[in-house]
Structures are given as structure tokens and as C-alpha cells.
Design a protein with these regions (language model features):
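Hydrophobic core residues within well-ordered beta-strands of beta-rich domains
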Residues: 31, 107, 120, 154-156, ...
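Gram-negative outer-membrane beta-barrel proteins
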Residues: 41-47, 130-136, 178-186, 255, ...
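Short acidic/polar hinge/loop motifs at secondary-structure boundaries
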Residues: 1-3
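Membrane-proximal, glycine/serine-rich, low-complexity loop/turn segments characteristic
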Residues: 5-240, 248-251
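Transmembrane beta-strands of outer-membrane beta-barrel proteins
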Residues: 33-35, 122-124, 170-172, 260-266, ...
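Outer-membrane beta-barrel pore domains and translocons
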Residues: 36-40, 127-129, 175-177, 250, ...
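Outer-membrane beta-barrel transmembrane domain signature of Gram-negative proteins
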Residues: 93-114, 201-214, 280-389
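Short loop/turn motifs that connect adjacent beta-strands in outer-membrane beta-barrel proteins
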Residues: 26-31, 118-119, 134, 167, ...
Length: 389
């Protein structure tokens, strides 16, 4: 809703419009169960085709020659890029195809149940979602050491409606979700994609021929290559859990005067996040040429390996919400009118990782009072009056 008159009853928070969300409720009748399982294969977004090592080196030579500079690679070196007879110093790596899969699977499962009688009705829903990552991983790692960018989420919801009396309705609701996100240790998505687009095919081999992990040796800055960064530096786990509960009481006061109604809502929500990072790094080497005596590669260790380290953290908050509404609508012949009063109270407080700042442990509160008066004659002439505080 964006009409100023319609949103005025929601106070200042409705200034930019109001979105009303209605969740499914139970229906009287026999139990009804719906189940659905889906799977899909998602192909990766179209990525650019990069030139190979020989083309890249040849274009580099052409760019230098047109500027009256000497060639970076001699013909015999270009031949090594083509034949890959010396991949330690003349590599040819398609980083995009090495790191990214062509596609990945997604799974969806959903279960809904509803039913009940004339007095009580219920609706229960549960769902599971899994999106597998599109990064290739090192299959020699342990099964519980996953460096892919996976996502899993569990959702649940339960709504119960109880007719306490013919004029009194009690609504109970609880909903929540638990989500887990996995990612490579030292290469988040932004960093890894930057490496895939920024690393040229001759910057560094994936590994040296003796199995050493390389550091970029064609840059003034030492950098991990994309494969080492995405598969050999550990992994990150992020968990997020949120629970939303609400109680609604609807009381019809037609026995006092027709059209008089009271609705009271109370909500209590919690939102918690936990993360754990387990990082490691192998020995990283730089090849500085070959020995004139033996012809063997001379390696320089640039960074020493360190075993898996662990860091963790968490955050959390809770929110309480109270909404009281009293309304009266009545028609007398061609005259139609209504009066509505609404009181809202919202409180939010951090519960985890509040630190030493006293303000972090204090609730943020908001109170509002709003009202609305409407009148129309024969649905032709309308008068609305709204206020909010």
C-alpha cells in the first residue's frame, strides 16, 4: 500500500509504503499433506573466453614492438608456450576452466500439512534447500574439508488458529530458518573472481613440476595463484539462525455495538549468526631460474606453511513487538463511517558480542500512536482524517 490515507494508520514507519504479508492458515477438514521434491542443474553464467598462453605472449610482443620496445619473448620461448615442454617457466593455464565447473546441482524439498476442526485449525510447513557450489575442489582433501561455495537452508513454519468462543479467535505462529554457507578460506567470492579475471595464463603454473605451490613470479607483488587460494587455504563456515513467534488475539464486540473489534498482536523474534574460519597455507615458492651446472630449478621459499588455525565469532539480537488496534465500522443507510486507533511498540536489543560500550546493551525502542476517521455518503463523497505520533 502506498496511498497516504491507507498507510497513515501505520504511523511514521508507513511513510514509504506498507507491504502486508499474509501467511497460509489451516482450514477445517481432513488432514491434507502436500510434498514436493525438485532438482535442477544450474549452468554457470557465460564467462569470457581468454586467450591461451602462446597468444597472450605473442600479443605482448606485438604491443611492445609497436612502442619501439624490445620483445618480451623470443621465438624459442614462444615455442615453449606452444609445446609446454617447460611448464614451470612457460605455463599455459586457463584459470577460468580450472577453477569453475560447468554447472552445479540444486535441490528443493517441501512438505505442507493443514487440517483441523471447527474449533482449531493448523498449518505446518517445512522445507530444505541446497545449492552446490561451482568451484572445483581438491579431491585429495578429507571429506569434511570442503572448500566449495555451498549453501544449505532449512525453513519451518507452524500456524494454529483456535476459536476460544464464537467471538474470540486466538492465533499462534512460529517460523524460523537455519542456514549454512561455506566458502574457500582465503579467497572470498569477490577476491577469487578478481583473480580469475586478473591472472593471465602465463603468470604462474598451477603447481611446479616437483609439487611445490607457486607464488606469482611474473608480478612485482607476491600473490597466490587462484587454485592455491581456492583449494589449499582452508574454509569458512557461516551459520545463521532466526526464529519468529507471534500471538494474535481477535475479539469481536458486536454484542456491545455492531462493528466494534479489537486485535492485539505480540511478537518475539531472535536472530543469531555464528561463523568459524579455519585457515591454512602451504609452503609457497618462487622459481628463480635453473642451475647452470645441473639444470635443476632453483627454488626460493617465499612463505612458510602454517597448520590449520581457527577463529570464530558470533552476533545476535532479539526483537519484541506489540500492536494493539481498536476499530469500529458501521453503516446507517447511505452513511458509512469508521474509527480506528492503533498503538505500536517495538524494542530491539543486541544479545551477543555487545563489547564494552554500554550503548550496545541498551534496547532501541520505538512507540507510536495513530488514528483514523473515515466517512462517506453513498460511496460518492469521502472524508478521511488521520493522525500519527
Amino acid at each position: 500500500m502506498k496511498d497516504a490515507s491507507a498507510t497513515a494508520i501505520y504511523g511514521s514507519k508507513g511513510a514509504n509504503g506498507v507491504v502486508l504479508i499474509t501467511t497460509k492458515r489451516g482450514k477445517a477438514g481432513k488432514i491434507n499433506i502436500d510434498a514436493k521434491v525438485e532438482t535442477s542443474y544450474n549452468t554457470r553464467t557465460i564467462t569470457p573466453e581468454f586467450v591461451d598462453g602462446l597468444s597472450y605472449a605473442s600479443l605482448m610482443n606485438e604491443a611492445l614492438v609497436t612502442r619501439n620496445l624490445g620483445m618480451a619473448y623470443q621465438p624459442e620461448e614462444l615455442e615453449l608456450f606452444r609445446t609446454q615442454m617447460d611448464p614451470d617457466f612457460y605455463p599455459n593455464v586457463d584459470w577460468m576452466d580450472l577453477i569453475l565447473k560447468n554447472g552445479a546441482w540444486s535441490y528443493r524439498a517441501n512438505l505442507n500439512m493443514n487440517g483441523g476442526g471447527n474449533t482449531a485449525r493448523y498449518f505446518v510447513s517445512a522445507s530444505y534447500t541446497e545449492d552446490q557450489g561451482m568451484y572445483n575442489t581438491d579431491q585429495t582433501l578429507r571429506d569434511d574439508y570442503d572448500t566449495n561455495a555451498n549453501y544449505k537452508k532449512w525453513n519451518y513454519r507452524m500456524n494454529v488458529d483456535i476459536d476460544i468462543t464464537k467471538s474470540t479467535l486466538l492465533k499462534l505462529g512460529i517460523a524460523g530458518s537455519l542456514a549454512k554457507r561455506n566458502s574457500p578460506g582465503l579467497a572470498d567470492n569477490e577476491m577469487l573472481w578478481g583473480m580469475l579475471f586478473g591472472y593471465n595464463p602465463i603468470a604462474t603454473p598451477v603447481y611446479y613440476s616437483n609439487g611445490y605451490a607457486p607464488i606469482s613470479h611474473r608480478d612485482n607483488v607476491n600473490k597466490l595463484n587462484p587454485w592455491v587460494a581456492s583449494t589449499q587455504t582452508g574454509y569458512n563456515e557461516d551459520w545463521q539462525n532466526n526464529v519468529q513467534t507471534n500471538v494474535t488475539l481477535e475479539q469481536n464486540f458486536d454484542f456491545i455495538t455492531k462493528g466494534l473489534k479489537f486485535v492485539g498482536r505480540f511478537g518475539y523474534d531472535t536472530d543469531n549468526s555464528n561463523w568459524i574460519n579455519r585457515h591454512r597455507q602451504p609452503d609457497l615458492y618462487k622459481a628463480n631460474g635453473r642451475s647452470q651446472e645441473t639444470g635443476e630449478i632453483i627454488y626460493e621459499k617465499m612463505f612458510s606453511a602454517y597448520d590449520m588455525t581457527q577463529s570464530s565469532g558470533s552476533s545476535g539480537k532479539r526483537r519484541e513487538f506489540l500492536d494493539l488496534l481498536l476499530s469500529w465500522e458501521r453503516a446507517f443507510g447511505n452513511h458509512h463511517g469508521g474509527v480506528t486507533f492503533r498503538y505500536t511498540q517495538d524494542s530491539e536489543k543486541r544479545t551477543v558480542d555487545i563489547g564494552t560500550d554500554i550503548k550496545n546493551g541498551v534496547s532501541k525502542r520505538n512507540q507510536g500512536l495513530a488514528g483514523r476517521f473515515t466517512y462517506n455518503w453513498n460511496y460518492r463523497y469521502f472524508v478521511d482524517f488521520n493522525f500519527g505520533y
